[in-house]
Amino acid sequence: MRVYKTNEIKNIALLGSAGSGKTTLAESMLFEAGVIKRRGSVEAKNTVSDYFPVELEYGYSVFPTVFHVEWNNKKLNIIDCPGSDDFVGGAITSMNVTDQAVILINGQYGPEVGTQNNFRYTEKLGKPVIFLVNQLDSDKCDFDNIIASMKEIYGPKCVQIQYPLETGPGFNSLIDVLLMKKYSWKPEGGAPIIEEIPEEEMDKAMELHKTLVEAAAENDEGLMEKFFESESLTEDEMREGIRKGLVTRSIFPVFCVCAGKSMGVRRLMEFLGNVVPFVDDMPKLHNTRGEEIAPDSNGPESVYFFKTGMEPHIGEVSYFKVMSGCVKPGDDLTNADRGSKERIGQIYACAGANRVAVEQLNAGDIGCTVKLKDVKTGNTLNGKDAEWRFDFIKYPNPKYSRAIKAVNAQDTEKLMAALLKMRQEDPTWIVEQSKELRQVIVRGQGEFHLRTLKWRLENNEKLNVVFEEPRIPYRETITKKARAEYRHKKQSGGAGQFGEVHLIVEPYAEGMPDPTSFTFNGQELKMNIKSREEVDLEWGGKLVFLNSVVGGAIDARFMPAILKGIMDCMEHGPLTGSYARDVRVIVYDGKMHPVDSNELSFMLAARHAFSDAFKQAGPKILEPIYDLEVYVPADFMGDVMSDLQGRRALIMGMDSEAGYQKLSAKIPLKELSNYSISLSSLTGGRASFTTKFASYELVPNDIQGKLIADHEAELAKEAE
């Protein structure tokens, strides 16, 4: 394989909802380019893209698959992205390292929620978009209705390049209004027959051609002037105008294919090779210092690792994009994230499970290598003339959580090691060994996401594991002031233990002034604040600790021990054992003994005094509340709202966005437990949602009572 220059390389992501035909399209592209001799199929489990055992088991893409084709003296690096929202990380990763998105639309359904999600991501990243209506041979395909929906959602920027003469099982021909030709195929597919447009289609074709010419001309002043003069452009001028329109996202070309029979795929590839932007046509990327980095093969060497794959008999396969310079086997590079040195071994052009050895990859190119010592997903490796880091991939928050444990407790360490290793393949799920919840928590993008994780643990790592309901990280706080005192005294011969602490607790809110006095039972207690310590609690909220002891009742040297005793208590609230937060404590009196007082005595006295005061101060349980955004077709809005109201959600607003309804709400984390499953069931998989932590709020009294009872029952069971 020859070495391609930067201006000969195009990087393309195949996006679309699950079932829209991305993997089938990838197979047809490889076939048309002569990379494979026979097209595989998802049903036969023999495609180039879906080759991991878990993908073959479930019949869905789980990981993005990188491959390349050589087409008309150009190299097209193509990434086949998973369509399920559960594996959105693969699509996000791919969009960040490619320069062109091809979004497939299922001809049976038209634009779906996955279409919308992918388009939103391209919008955030400013990536060019081509729409591709697939499965035109389906008897459910209504092409005109699909185009109408697309124009309603995406506006006049959607410009048809092609339209089919017939849809359904009889589909075998289309009109291309860029080339002004008719393309047709034999029933089994194969090479197209290219003919003149039939007379009865000429009016429609000319109308669409004129729209396309105008859209292309709008992206260049010179082309616009010519269009005004002659109302026409040459084919090359149209290509140039469309290329500029793609870069600025002012035009979204619409193509037609039947990927299963390879009808229209060759024409699509010609367009990708001849029209879509090269790597160096796109805006420059920025490093973490905000500096623009051009894809210059003569520049300093810098390589960004965007994906790690774990393959049997090989181990880690590290996928990278050359950001600047060129990379060759034997190059000595420095890991900008970890400080370690790496020598690059053999480098490859990617071809799914296969690889093609190459002698060099230039700026903008994508490849992979194996057997690196200390490189993780997201790391940057630099040559001696570069000191750059790239960190531009931002993943969505997890939406579905489960506690996981090994059936055999002896496998716990092995389980954690396997989880940490597997996370290199997919950064969109998180593993946490929670001290607070006393569980190992895995958080992912949905039930299917974690189900495939479990399958891989059991089948690849030979670990027998179970999922459980994760505990909720409740918090405890107080709602009124209270005071308490406690004397710790212990005498058993020799030096004893003595410490007495008098303290007041009250709710704390940001910006509260320090108190000057308190009144209890008609008695006023004056406060003379001698020291103040504000603790930002690692679990959220604050503890404010004030020393108001006068007259030397307690030496200042014992105050750290008193604070430690209080902090120990705040780690185990009295209601449910949850962390406590947002409390102000004022130590105002106490006693000490000249011989028996020590730090332990005051720590224990403070612990008891604080616990007693907390229980008297109107203790309440707080629950985590999340911001929720649901994208749902209007037909399902009523059902979704009813379901949310049954989950104690507070509806904050509704809006229309790209043909869908966007519903905003605040909802307790407890009620999100199986929301992804319920939403999919309610909408037939046509809705999606995002979540983000918002705040902690008081739980209703009836729920507080149940939580306390459950905690007491758990303690009783542990004591048996």
Residue ranges and their predicted role:
Residues M1-E720:
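Structural and coupling elements of P-loop NTPases
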